[in-house]
């Protein structure tokens, strides 16, 4: 009789241990799912947005560069253009002197350059922006790798019995 109740207590002890392990595992699963959703995915989306802005910036500089190269090639000392007044509302304009150009170098600061200086500046800016995109892509891939690793870990945690 005595030995029977002893094994019964032993079984309860095992059940309590099992219960405890299960609870810890569920807590871990919840913790890592929250970490993925509230931290990693947020970082990932922000990093992707940041990279998009840099790519857009790069595109604008490259467009400007090709326009400047056209001015130089065609030896245009004056030109007609359309100026965007905002909200896609344009007005015709005539540029009397194309030997100088004002380039937005960031933070709303415009610098007066000769066309050749502007090309030189844009080439440097292009190198910098390409490097930035490269770094942001690395960061995005690192975050994606972290998410994958944790998701694989979660899969294993969920399949443990």
UniProtKB/Swiss-Prot annotation:
Molecular function via GO: transcription corepressor activity
Pfam family, one: Prefoldin
SUPFAM superfamilies, A to Z: Prefoldin
InterPro entries xrefs: Prefoldin, Prefoldin_subunit_alpha, UXT
Biological process annotations from GO: negative regulation of transcription by RNA polymerase II
Single GO cellular component term: chromatin
Covalent S-S links between cysteines: none
Family designation: Belongs to the UXT family.
Protein name stated in the entry: Protein UXT homolog
Species for this entry: Dictyostelium discoideum (Social amoeba)
């Amino acid at each position: 009789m005595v030995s029977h109740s002893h094994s019964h207590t032993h079984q309860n002890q095992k059940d309590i241990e099992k219960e405890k392990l299960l609870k810890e595992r569920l807590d871990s699963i919840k913790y890592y799912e929250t970490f993925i959703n509230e931290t990693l995915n947020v970082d990932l989306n922000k990093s992707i947005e940041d990279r998009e802005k840099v790519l857009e910036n790069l595109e604008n500089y490259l467009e400007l560069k090709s326009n400047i190269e056209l001015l130089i090639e065609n030896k245009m000392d004056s030109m007609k253009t359309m100026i965007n007044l905002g909200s896609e509302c344009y007005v015709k304009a005539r540029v009397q002197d194309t030997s100088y150009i004002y380039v937005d170098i960031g933070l709303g600061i415009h610098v007066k350059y000769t066309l050749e200086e502007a090309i030189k500046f844009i080439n440097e800016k292009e190198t910098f922006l390409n490097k930035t995109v490269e770094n942001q892509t690395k960061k995005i891939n690192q975050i994606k790798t972290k998410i994958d690793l944790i998701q694989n870990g979660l899969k294993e945690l969920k399949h443990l019995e």
